[in-house]
């Protein structure tokens, strides 16, 4: 079951550097929320805090609350690995395990969790590949290396790997930036289907993509280089693109800066 996320007074730091300040944001379930904004504004940084991925960077920490259906994912008794199973991540560059087979790629997370039943692993692989709209393209070569797929297929393989562990939320950090237009369209179509089962947050530099795939858009910016990024405006995507309330948002959407 998809879950909501709520960010309350979130501030993100890398050591002494204040990267993002005072973010308050509601991310609804079974919808796509897009993060947009100029480079360096903190949108990918915020995305990575949503499943504690930023913690792999020494000195990184968060102040404030990030709640998943009301539970603080930074609570003292919360296991970061469990958070990352519940809130999956798809990265900018497709990163399948190149020497693993297609099927092994999809079920890698389950195997790490101790699942050994071959029948169940095969069933999960098929379900996840179907969910990623990839099954019909690879069903006759599941034993072939994942690294042998095209770029667009590799990205959908990574999406299949993410959804195989049945997360509640799916984070996507510029998932189409390295793809050709046809592969991009395939991933965008997939995002529309996935939101029926998952809460989705996507970072994108592509304004047209944000307008096409998202239900809600959050615009981030920063006053100057070296200053913290901040959430300027959030609202329904149609409103943000057609009638934003902040001039800074309008300037960015219209291409006057960024």
Curated annotation (Swiss-Prot):
Membrane topology reported for the UniProt record: Peripheral membrane protein
Residue intervals of the ABC transporter domain: 5-253
Protein residues bound to ATP: 37-44
A Gene Ontology BP annotation from the UniProt entry: phosphate ion transmembrane transport
Subcellular location field: Cell membrane
Alphabetized Pfam families for the sequence: ABC_tran
Record-linked SUPFAM superfamilies: P-loop containing nucleoside triphosphate hydrolases (SSF52540)
Gene Ontology cellular component annotations, sorted alphabetically: plasma membrane
Family: Belongs to the ABC transporter superfamily. Phosphate importer (TC 3.A.1.7) family.
Subunit structure as annotated in this protein's UniProt entry: The complex is composed of two ATP-binding proteins (PstB), two transmembrane proteins (PstC and PstA) and a solute-binding protein (PstS).
Protein name, UniProt field: Phosphate import ATP-binding protein PstB
Organism: Corynebacterium jeikeium (strain K411)
Native organism taxonomy: Bacteria, Bacillati, Actinomycetota, Actinomycetes, Mycobacteriales
Gene: pstB
């Amino acid at each position: 079951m998809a879950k909501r996320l709520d960010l309350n007074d979130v501030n993100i730091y890398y050591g002494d550097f204040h990267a993002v300040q005072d973010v308050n944001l509601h991310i609804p379930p079974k919808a796509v929320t897009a993060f947009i904004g100029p480079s360096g504004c903190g949108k990918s940084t915020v995305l990575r805090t949503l499943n504690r991925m930023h913690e792999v960077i020494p000195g990184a920490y968060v102040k404030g609350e990030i709640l998943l259906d009301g539970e603080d994912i930074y609570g003292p008794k919360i296991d970061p690995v469990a958070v990352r199973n519940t809130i999956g991540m798809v990265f900018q560059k497709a990163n399948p395990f190149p020497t693993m087979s297609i099927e092994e790629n999809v079920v890698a997370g389950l195997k790490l969790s101790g699942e050994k039943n071959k029948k169940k692993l095969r069933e999960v692989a098929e379900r996840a590949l179907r969910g990623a709209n990839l099954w019909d393209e690879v069903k006759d070569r599941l034993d072939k290396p994942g690294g042998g797929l095209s770029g667009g297929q590799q990205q959908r393989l990574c999406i299949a790997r993410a959804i195989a562990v049945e997360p509640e939320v799916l984070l996507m950090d510029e998932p189409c930036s390295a793809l050709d237009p046809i592969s991009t369209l395939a991933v965008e179509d997939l995002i529309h289907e996935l939101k029926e089962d998952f809460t989705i947050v996507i970072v994108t530099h592509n304004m047209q993509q944000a307008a096409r795939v998202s239900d809600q858009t959050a615009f981030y910016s920063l006053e100057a280089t070296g200053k913290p990024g901040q959430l300027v405006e959030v609202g329904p995507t149609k409103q943000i693109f057609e009638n934003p309330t902040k001039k800074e948002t309008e300037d960015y959407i219209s291409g006057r800066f960024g």
